[in-house]
Amino acid sequence: PCYNEALTIGKVIDDFHRELPGAIVYVYDNNSSDDTSQIAKQHGATVRHEPRQGKGNVCRQMFRDIDAECYLMVDGDDTYPAEAAKSLCNPILNGEADMTVGDRLSNGTYAEENKRAFHGFGNNLVRAMIKWIYGYSFDDVMTGYRAMSKPFVKTFPVLSEGFQIETELSIHAVDHRWRIKDVPVEYRDRPAGSVSKLNTVSDGIKVIAMIGTLFKDYRPLKFFSLIALIFAIVGLALGLP
């Protein structure tokens, strides 16, 4: 998925062609106003366009369009190392996992490199919520670097429109008991001149809302029992003299 990544997309494509010479590199341009598409074509990528704005919309179309044994998804901002591609893909191709997750947190590189306020806090909050609801602890739930099997991709109903997609992928994997493997990867911040499209506050609220929606859909008994308990406590409190 790409939106205005002309500064970095050429290097990203070259790096992944080098590490995975037999792979087809797709770039889904999400209404870029710069030269992202032209540069991607010049570097040998297959370029497609998604007019509906938002990373979730892009992923929905990608998963519909592409047939592959292994799907490696990465952002076009050159923050994820192509050198980790085989470590992510091999467990999928060897039948050991259905989704591998590029973990930026365990080795400390995300904390060192990321300069945007509250991103680490938001990641930890979402991890804690997923662990409490679903009982599974991800090392890095918000990473955009993942590999997935064909059965996983083709049975995943994408509901998200935007940056909630990583959270939705994670919850879907846990709820449907897909095999998950965390793979530590090095993280590097965006190069000078490259701008993040993520809005910490508004996108963070959307992620939390998505967790609530999926909690209701995937764990309705637990969700409505919790709501009933809250109302019961409030009712008792209001009824006490």
Locate each region found by the language model.
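Hydrophobic helical membrane-anchoring modules
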Residues: 158-241
